[in-house]
Amino acid sequence: MVSYASIRQSSDEADSTVDASQKLDARKQDLNNFIQRHIGPSSADIQHMLDVLGFSSLDDLIEKTVPSTIRLHKKLQLPTAQTEYAALAKLKQIASKNQVFRSYIGMGYYDTITPPVIGRNILENPGWYTAYTPYQPEIAQGRLEALLNFQTMIIDLTGLEIANASLLDEATAAAEAMSMSYGVSKNKANAYFVSHDCHPQTIDVLQTRAKPLGIEIIIGDHQTFDFQKPIFGAVLQYPASDGTIYDYRAFIETAHAQGALVTVAADPLSLTLLTPPGEFGADIAVGSTQRFGIPLGFGGPHAAYFATKEEYKRQVPGRIVGVSKDVNGKTALRLALQTREQHIRREKATSNICTAQVLLAVMASMYAVYHGPEGLKQIAENIHQLTVTLAEGLKRLGYKISSEHFFDTLRVELGTNNLETILAGCQARNINLRIFDETAVGISLDETTTPEDLIDLWQIFAGEDNLPFTPEELISSLNLPLRSSSYLTHPVFNRYHSETELLRYLHRLETKDLSLTTSMIPLGSCTMKLNATSEMIPVTWEEFGRIHPFAPLTQTRGYQILFQQLEAWLAEITGFAGVALQPNAGSQGEYTGLLVIRQYHESRGETHRNVCLIPTSAHGTNPASAVMCGMKVVAVACDAGGNIDIDDLKAKAEKHSHELAALMVTYPSTHGVFEAGIQEICAVIHSHGGQVYMDGANMNAQVGICRPGDIGADVCHLNLHKTFCIPHGGGGPGMGPIGVASHLVRFLPGHPVLGSGKNPQNIGAVAAAPWGSASILVISWMYIAMMGADGLTQATKVAILNANYIAKRLETYYPVLYKGQNGLVAHECILDLRALKKSANIEIDDIAKRLIDYGFHAPTVSWPVTGTIMVEPTESESQAELDRFCDALIAIRQEIAAIEAGKMDTHNNLLKNAPHTIESLIVGEWLHPYSREQAAYPVSWTREYKFWPSVGRIDAAFGDRNFVCSCLPMEAYN
C-alpha cells in the first residue's frame, strides 16, 4: 500500500503531494480502463500508423475521411465510462431487481437444466461464440458437425426428411413456413388457416407477416373448419397451447385434398413420446429447441427449427448444412444449396434470414448428444408423469382439467373458485401461472419440476384447507398416444453420455474451427471485434437467465431498467427519438423498419406508396426484406467510384414519385467509403414523399462521429452483434433493434401478451418475445457502459485508422477498388483481385483458401463486387496483428508472381492446392512442384503456432448434387 506520508517532508510540499496522489489515482484508473483493453493498438501503434498515412492525429484523419457536413460536433451524452468491475457491480444491482419466480406459464417457454459441461464449454467458451458463419467450411468443420447433429435430431424427432440449421424463434419459423407454403402451394388461394390453439405470439407474428403480402389469416377451430374458403396452407400447434393433444390426421387429409400444405408447430421434447408430425402427414414442422438446455433469458436467444420434405429443399429458409467431400475424397461438411439464400437471390428470395441461432443450436444438439434418446425420453416421461399426478390431485380438489390427453400442460377450469385467490396463493409462493381468462389458468411443467413443487401447486388450489391426499396416492400411468418409431439412433447420440467423453468431443470439434481465439477475422461488413469476457459474464446470471418472457412486469424491473437505459443510449448514439429492441436479427431489423415505414404511409392514406429504391451494391437482405414488406424493388445504379449515382437516383425518384415508399441505403456505403452526397440523397427521397431507411451494418464507422438521424435517415437498424459486441456465435445469435425519427415512434412493434406501451397503430409483433433475445442485451449494455462517449468515439476512429493502414500497406500489391474524396476508406476496404485470373489463373477462392495456411480466415469474398475481397479489421486488432495479416497477403501475392513469371505451374501450385492439411503433407507421395515446408510453414509465425484445417478444399458442387443434411454412418468419417 502506498503511504503518501513518506513523501510529505514539509507543509510546503503538501500541494505537490496532492498532485502526486491524483496522478497515481489516474494511473490506477488507466490500468483498469476498459477502453485500453478493448482497443487493440497502443498509443505508439496509433501514432506509427498515422505516420504511415501522413496524418498528425486521429482527428486529422477523421477530418479528411468523414464529410464535414455530417460530422457530429458535440460529445455524445452518455454516462461516464466505468471499469469492468464497476460496470459488473452496477449491472448486478440492476439484475437484483428482477424476481426469479417458478414460472409454469408455458406457451413455448420452459425452465430447463443446462448441463454444466455444455454451459462451460460452449456458452462460456470464446472458441465457440466468437466464430463467424461457416462460409469458409474448411475451418468450420467443428460447428458444422454440431449443426449436422442438430439437423439430424430435428429430422428424427419430427419424422420429416430435411431440416435447417436453426431459425430465430418459433413464431418466426411459423411465419417462414407460411411464406414457403404460399410459394409452393399448387392452388391459387391467398388465405391461410391458423388454429386458435396456437400460441398467441405465433398468431400475432403470422398476422404481422401476412398483412403486407396480402395474405388473409383465418383464425379458427381446426375441428369445425369446413374448408369452404380455399386455403393454401395451415398451421396447427402440437400439443396445443392449452396442452391438448389432438389427432390432426383428418384435418391434414382434407387440407391436402385442397392442395394446401400443413405446418405443425411441435414441442420437440414431446416428440420423444408422441407420434411425430411427419408420420401423420405434416408437410412442415417448426418449433423451438429452448427446452433442450437453453435458459429462458426473458425470451431468448433460442434456436428454432424448421423441417420439411425433401421436395422443398430449395425453398427452405435459412442455412442448411450438407455433406460433401474434399479434394482427397474425405467426407466434409459445408453450407448447402446457398443459391436459394437472400445474398444470392436478393429480391427473388422467399426469406431474408441471414443470421440465425447457431450457438444455441449447437447447445441444443449437444443436450441431445449428452442425454441420448433414452435420456430425453426419461426427461419427457418424468415431466408427463408429474403432470398426470398434478392433474389427478387437482381433480380431487374439485377442479376440472379441460383435456383428456396432454403432455406437460394443463388448462384448469376454476369453476366457482376465485381467480384472485389463486393468484394471491401464487404470489405468496413465488409462482407464475398462465391466465387464460377469469375462469381458467394454465400450468406447464418442465424438467426442473419436483414432487415438492406439486405440493405447492396443490396447496394454492386447496386454499387454507389441508391436502386430502399425498403425492404417493396419485401416481398413475402415462396417458399418451405414444410414438412407435425410433429416433436418435446415430452413434453420435449414443456415445458421449459421460462428461469426460462429451468434454473431449466438444474440444475436438472446437479445435477444428478458426475463431477470434486464433486470429483476426477480417470479414468486411461483419465487424468481428472483441467480445469481452466482462460483457459475456452477465449472460449466465440467473437473474437474467431464469425469467419467463411473459412473467408479470412487476417481476422484471431489472430488465425494464436495462431496456430503458439501453434504448436511451442507442437513441443518443443514432440521433433518433425512439428505439425498439424486439427484432432479434439484423434481417428482422430491416424488415421491422420497412414495416414501420409502410404503416406510416398507410396512416396518411398513402397505401399506394410501395416502391423501394435500393442501390445495386446493397446487401441481399435489403431487397429480400423489401419484398417481404410488399414493396416493389427498383434498383439504383452506382457510379464508377462506387457511390450511388445521384442522377440515376433523381430520375428513379421522379419516375416513381407517386409510389415512392422508401430508399434503403447503407452508410458508410457497402463499398467502404463515406459518400459525400448522403444528405442530398436523403433530401431527394424526402422531396418525393419517401422515407429513408439506413442499413446500420456499417455503424462501427459512425458511432460518436456522425449519426443517422442527423444525416437525414428516418429509420436505421443496428446490428448489436457487430457494432455493440454481441458475439456472432458461428452464425447467431444477433439482435437488430431499430431507431426511428419522432414521426415514426407510434408505429414501433407491439406484442399480444405483455403489450408494449406503444400506440395502437403499432405494426404488431415481429418476434415471439416482447424484447426479442433479451438476455444478450446485457452484452451491449456492458460495452457502452464501459466505453462511455469518449471510448466509443475513439473505437470508431481507430477502426477507420486500422482499415486505412491496411489499405495503405496493401495498395501496391492489390488495387484498393474504392476510396473517398481524399483517397481514404471508411472502416473497411475492397481489394481488387480480378486481374489475377488473367495473369495467373488465380480465382478469389484460391487466395481465400491459401490464407488458411497462414492462419487467417478470409475477408468477405466477391461482395459487394465479384472478384474482390472486402477487409474490415475493427478497432480491436493490434498493429502487430494487422501487420501479420498484411504480410500474409503480401507473401501470397509473391506466390502469385511466381506463377505469373512461369516459375510455378498454373494448376499445381500453392494456391490451387490450398488449404494443406497435415494428412496431405505426410501421407502418400508428394506430387507438387513446391516443398512441404512451403505449403505448411510459409512464414515464420506459423512455426510458433499453426492452425491446421481438418479437411482439404471442399467440393461444393458435389454436395449440392448429392444432397444429404443428416448424419452419415460413422464409417463415412474415417
Curated annotation (Swiss-Prot):
It catalyses: N(6)-[(R)-lipoyl]-L-lysyl-[glycine-cleavage complex H protein] + glycine + H(+) = N(6)-[(R)-S(8)-aminomethyldihydrolipoyl]-L-lysyl-[glycine-cleavage complex H protein] + CO2. InterPro entries: GcvP (IPR003437), GDC-P_C (IPR049316), GDC-P_N (IPR049315), GDC_P (IPR020581), PyrdxlP-dep_Trfase (IPR015424), PyrdxlP-dep_Trfase_major (IPR015421), PyrdxlP-dep_Trfase_small (IPR015422). Its EC number is 1.4.4.2. GO terms for molecular function: glycine binding; glycine dehydrogenase (decarboxylating) activity; pyridoxal phosphate binding. The modification N6-(pyridoxal phosphate)lysine is found at residue 722. It comes from the Bacteria. Keywords: Oxidoreductase, Pyridoxal phosphate. CDD domains: GDC-P. Gene3D superfamilies: Aspartate Aminotransferase, domain 1 (3.90.1150.10), Type I PLP-dependent aspartate aminotransferase-like (Major domain) (3.40.640.10). The keyword Oxidoreductase applies. GO terms for cellular component: cytosol; glycine cleavage complex. Pfam families: GcvP2_C, GDC-P. GO terms for biological process: glycine decarboxylation via glycine cleavage system. Its cofactor is pyridoxal 5'-phosphate. It is an enzyme of class 1 (oxidoreductase). Residues 1-20 are annotated as: Disordered. Coiled coil: none annotated. The keyword Transferase does not apply. The glycine cleavage system is composed of four proteins: P, T, L and H. HAMAP family: GcvP. Belongs to the GcvP family. The glycine cleavage system catalyzes the degradation of glycine. The P protein binds the alpha-amino group of glycine through its pyridoxal phosphate cofactor; CO(2) is released and the remaining methylamine moiety is then transferred to the lipoamide cofactor of the H protein. This is Glycine dehydrogenase (decarboxylating). It comes from Trichormus variabilis (strain ATCC 29413 / PCC 7937) (Anabaena variabilis). The gene is gcvP.
